[in-house]
Amino acid sequence: MQARQPPHDRILDAAMRVFRRHGFRRSSIEQAADEAGLTRQALYHHFPSKEALFCAAIERLYERAVLAETAAAKAAEATDAALSDILIAEIGARLGTLFAALEGSPHLEELFSEHLAQARDPYQTYSARFEAEVAKTVARVCRARRLKLASGVTVEELARCGEMAIHGTKSAYPSMQPADAFLNQLAVMLRMLIAGAMAPQTAPPAKRSQRKVCVSTGDRR
């Protein structure tokens, strides 16, 4: 028998459907309550306002994105993928989780805008976490493979530049749609960024000849 979904999760799932369908401004507590199969008073027992409900839904989405990006990075590492491919997989999984939650909504730009206004604290907290996860991946891969960053480049700076690449790609795709085009362009930027951040690989020294030389005759054997 399938376990019943906890009320908190059921409400947030319903709220995301409502926000995706109507946008933030045209959504209401009543709509979210109806979608969750609750009365308005019952929903208020969990969340005091539409703004609090939206903020909680966004925060849960961010947490799922962290889990997705961490799993994607480790999976890519296990295949011996290049550092650039690992980071592209990691950041792509994070963004893919966010895209999937809002897929099909005609209110994408509004939702992206409102989440910055209504969920400012979670946005700042998770932005730092996202960047920290990328930094941990870079450090872990470089340590395991004995890779070195270019002189003057730190793990933290590379991770920060990776996040800036996301914002840079947004300038061409403000709503990050179509998602495939956005992610492809972001991948190009990340590859170029990472290539420039790595120190040149040092070639191993050439092996010396092992042939013996006979001193007395000069003959080589």
For each feature predicted by the language model, list its residue ranges.
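N-terminal intrinsically disordered/low-complexity leader segments
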Residues: 1-5, 201-221
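Helix-turn-helix
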Residues: 10, 14, 18-52, 56
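Amphipathic alpha-helical interaction segments
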Residues: 10, 85-93, 110, 153, ...
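Alpha-helical DNA-contacting segments of helix-turn-helix folds
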Residues: 55-61, 65
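Hydrophobic alpha-helical connector segments
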Residues: 56, 70-100, 155-159
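Amphipathic alpha-helical packing segments from all-alpha helical-bundle domains
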Residues: 66, 85, 97, 117-144, ...
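Helix-loop "lid/cap" segments that line or gate small-molecule binding pockets
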Residues: 72-73, 92-99, 106-116, 193-194
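Amphipathic C-terminal alpha-helical segment
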Residues: 93-100, 131, 135-136, 140, ...
